[in-house]
Amino acid sequence: MERVRKNFATADNVLEPPHLISMQRISYEEFLQIDRAPEEREDVGLQAILKNIFPINDFNGLCSLEFLKYKFGEPKYTVQECQQRGMSYEIPLKIVVRLITFDVDEETGVQTIRDMKEQEVFLGSLPLMTADGVFVVNGTERVIVSQLQRSPGLFYSHDNGKSHSSGKLLYSARIIPVRGSWIDLEFDIKDVLHVRIDRRRKFPVTTLLKALGYSSEELLREFYPLENVKLSDGKYWVRFVAEHTAGQRLEFDLVNPQDGEILAKKGRKISKALCRKAVEAGIEFIEASSETILGKVLASAITLAGAEEPLYPCNTEITETVLENLAENGINEFETLFMDGVNYSASFSHTLRLDKVITTAEALLEIYRRLRPSSPPTLEIATTFFENLFFNPDLYDLSEVGRYKINAKLGLKTDIEHRALTRDDIIYGVRYLVRLKDNQGGIDDIDHLGNRRVRTVGELVENQYRMGLVRMERAIKERMTLQDVETLMPHDLINPKPISAAIKEFFGTSQLSQFMDQTNALSEVTHKRRLSALGPGGLSRERAGFEVRDVHPTHYGRICPIETPEGPNIGLIVSLATYARVNPYGFIETPYRKVENRVILDDIRYLSALEEQKQIIAPALVALEADHQSISEGNLIAREEGDVITIGSDNVTYMDVAPNQMISVAASLVPFLENDDANRALMGSNMQRQAVPLLVTAAPLVGTGMERYVARDSGACLLSAGDGVVEEVDSNRVVVRYDKPGVDGYDTGVAVYRLTKYKKSNQNTCFTQTPTILPGLKVEKGTLLADGPGCEAGELALGKNLTVAFMPWRGFNYEDSILINERLLKEDAYTSIHIDVFETMARDTKLGKEEITRDIPNVSEDTLRNLDDSGIVRVGAEIKPGDTLVGKVTPKGETVLSPEEKLLRAIFGEKAQDVKDSSLRVPPGVTGVVIDAKVFSRKGVDKDERSLMIEDLEIERLEGDKRDELRSLKNGVCRELGELIAGNTALGDILDSKGELLISSGDKIEVVHAIAIGFHRLKDIDFSGMADCTDRMDAAYERYQKQAEVIAQRYDGIIERQKKGDDLPPGVVKMVKVYVATKRKLSVGDKMAGRHGNKGVVSRILPEEDMPYFANGDTVDIVLNPLGVPSRMNVGQILEVHLGFAAKNLGAQLEKLAEQYAVEEIKAKLSRVYSDSEYHAIIDGKTDAEVIDWAYRHRKGLHMATPVFDGAEEAEIRKLLIESGVDKGGQSQLYDGLTGEPFANLVTVGVMYMLKLHHLVDNKIHARSTGPYSLVTQQPLGGKAQFGGQRLGEMEVWAMEAYGAAYTLKEFLTVKSDDVEGRTTMYERIVKGNNFLTTGLPESFHVLVKELQGLCLNMELIEE
């Protein structure tokens, strides 16, 4: 039964958190489309790439290879087999292709089909994702982390005035495709607009526009409005356009042409009102001075009648000479460009003037020269090159996201499927940039989540697969030309190696393919929900600035502002918020409830950062009316465009779905997070991921209600796949018979769940499952069947609930040190199991095969005491450093034999051949018990006794599972048939399976009789008198036969694989893996932490009698330093301690009441503590005995849930403290265990959830007496891994000098370090008892001399 927690939440639970790893699973499912029929597959993922690359045509157009469909085979091994054998869990991919050959008529050039060949071709294997969202690669579980990347599209920015000393803003734009050339547009300090393609040399943007087919005149008309100027009676008149004229001053009086009235005097500023008057008066032109006309620019070329060349080309600046020439030639009307220096500057006109290119052909050639300087172009080559650069969908891809972004930015209506650039994209993009420079529009914020998208697993693998396919395409084209196509079949052309190599490289070595963090269930879930800005195509740590790393307003509800690593990756690796999801375009969406006129609708919508911009969003904890259906009247605090504003509730359009919507899963596991400083909250949420699963788990008394979701979705716990009945339970497996067949993925209706026992995780912690269900119980979909590591009752349980006192204790909790009660060690409270795996391989060497054997030369029998006859350590053996785990001998090189040895060889045969001991031994620092040994032998090699024994045990286990599954199936059919015949009268005597009388003739048949009769005898009984019965029985039998066959085939396949040899790496004959479990108790030096960033190291484990104790004699478990709280500002831990104290004492009260069998008092107590719904969930349907049992099971404390941002108030905690019978201030009188005296002040005491972290002192501490030396310097190596020594550095030398210990120092620096001769002499002298020190020269001095000689400086030692 699911645990009921006392929940302090006030907000309605409108939306359950989604499945926490659905992002990974959905993405990869969409990539493979494995469950869809070929004809139903959409053009995404694998289908899209294959359709994109195929058809592949040869260079002469004589043959074509077309893609028809793809299909998948069955995985060769199960996930568990892959992990044991070090294989990859993958699925074979086959494609059906058609090879068409053509005949070409040489005269007409018409193609006719000569031949068509269709064939299914193997295209390599693809890694398959497990149900938990991980990939098994070479036996290890890996996660593909999603990447946060700048979205493709069009972006505008400026340099913040940093490029030039004047501080002038230089604007730029960039068009980023997914595949293809980048376009950069940028203004220089002189306001000339340049373009760069792929960051090459820049050239004027007008060259690019002319290459698109625009003439200079068309370009000017695109960028500027036109003004009409005419000359009459020696005066210049400019056409009146209200928008252009507003804000200017009149040079002459403005006269109404109809009645001559002066509407405005000269010198007056033209207002909007005056513009309206002028329009009403029908004024078409206003008078302008010649000075005004000077400096304007001609919009079109002016050509005299009959002349070929224009008098003045367009874009000519008007000077006095130009005006005189125009008047002389009788040109009284012309068009100019409107430039006011505010909304329309001269920059584009100026750029066009600097551009020497005139025609489209010249522009194309110029661009070709810039990008391909070496080869001389022809117009045809240049045109094709330019078309391929941006407009060929095969070579340039904006992706749907890029197209969507460009359409949104420029207001275009281009079809979303059109993924190459268009002329409009470029011209409107340039126009937007010119307007931007003229202060119209705004730049893009690159850290806005509307401009950053997530590339999930599916997309990352898709990109990799495309690279492999492109390589394969090249190879296919070459083969088509080199070989005779008529005789070829498709499989002769297709070689899947480039694809397999690309996929292997990605999964094995990519920065985004990571070794899964498997320390506990939470670290698994968090790793799968992680987003990284690093990796190929992303940022690098060195170049990422502060802005990219910082929290952005659009992160709200999408990316957690708290959970990110400390150190160089801060802000670059982040976590998805609890309710967030990724939409098909890769943008992160978060759910909101729709609000209209203050009424909250049932409609929940997911909005991306861009869609959210125009909305006004209220928080989840906003004041509601009594019916909880609408928001209260008045002002409230809401969010709009990233700002927090106060606004009337009538204006709200959406509201949050949950208070913890903005934070990640790990952060939402911290109770009272709202009372912690952000830095400590970050540490708290990060350190939970490092907690080691303990031997005995306990869920936190003070939780947040999120614990069960993490346990449910991590895959650590075993859940029921559907409704059914538990048939059988033991410590190794659970058998469930489901009501409907097909629930468990097989069409049998029976599932044997084999629990994972003592499996090594990636971080060497122990992964083991414990059943929590009883046989005969009914289960529903999602019912907990077994708890995983670090879980209890289906909830995450990473630590222990400890009674904590905040007080100094004789300096042992100085600087965050922790004082621990020895009782915790006796109770194994913080004991964890860690599993190491050691493996060795017997290889086939040049000198002969290595052999795994117990027969090892020159080794005592005592050393081999734990090995069996095959030379492999027995399971259950206790081992310590240096013990032999697997005996192995390697042949030595052939030596020249003496006559005596030849004689021995002749007498004793090969046995006397030289072999050396290369056994696998336990490394330093490892002690424990051998829990398993696995032997893998190459196919065709005889298996040893141990291999056969392991194989027999495994086959026996599988046969047992098969029997149980068939028995459950039979019982199910018997029950079904029993229900069918129940109530009918027996036509004759019916015997049971043992042959004894069960039902006499004429008696009524009941359901239970069917099982007693037995499955096989049921069908021999005459049921002819019952209508429809025989047919239905036959159908049931037929179904049983089919289902039994499915079960038999499945198990037989696994058993067959067990009997076969194993696939081992080349040259390996046999491989042995030995698993050693180590029990780690809590010890001094271990790191512990709470959930609020309060971490420390165990400084002393104090005997129970010396610990501070309460008046009733109970001792506290742990003593923490009170000074660790105020400066860290993580007050959440104090609130947790108080609430935990209330929870614990309520449990103690329930225990007393249970002992007194006071059922009514228990119910009264529970009704005061819990809400009505929680109370009924606990009490309803329970007998008095069950209520007592419930109370007794909760004797250690009642479980509370205080959700983040919606948790327990101070008054509620006080109320519970009073209810639990302790001081409402949460302080108690403690007594000193050493003296028995009471402490002077009251002490804050309570219950805190403390974790043991993965930084265990046993893994870090290390000492050496003798060991390996460095070859060059002859000094001991450094570090635990190398079994190195302790470094005696320069500071230590100074210390020795300060004490004047010259001889000791000399000994340190010579014979104890790298004086080779001195070392040997010293050893001899100690052996002979002549302890007198003589030293030589340290080896490092010789190294220094050699180094100097390398610099051509000869140095000789003069010994006198």
Swiss-Prot record:
This protein's UniProt keywords: DNA-directed RNA polymerase, Nucleotidyltransferase, Transcription, Transferase
GO cellular component entries: DNA-directed RNA polymerase complex
Catalyzed chemical reaction(s): RNA(n) + a ribonucleoside 5'-triphosphate = RNA(n+1) + diphosphate
GO molecular function: DNA binding; DNA-directed RNA polymerase activity; ribonucleoside binding
GO biological process terms on file: DNA-templated transcription
NCBIfam families cross-referenced by the UniProt entry: PRK00405.1, rpoB
Subunit organization: The RNAP catalytic core consists of 2 alpha, 1 beta, 1 beta' and 1 omega subunit. When a sigma factor is associated with the core the holoenzyme is formed, which can initiate transcription.
Similarity section: Belongs to the RNA polymerase beta chain family.
Function of the protein: DNA-dependent RNA polymerase catalyzes the transcription of DNA into RNA using the four ribonucleoside triphosphates as substrates.
Protein name per UniProt: DNA-directed RNA polymerase subunit beta
Lineage of the species this protein comes from: Bacteria, Pseudomonadati, Thermodesulfobacteriota, Desulfobulbia, Desulfobulbales
Gene this chain is encoded by: rpoB
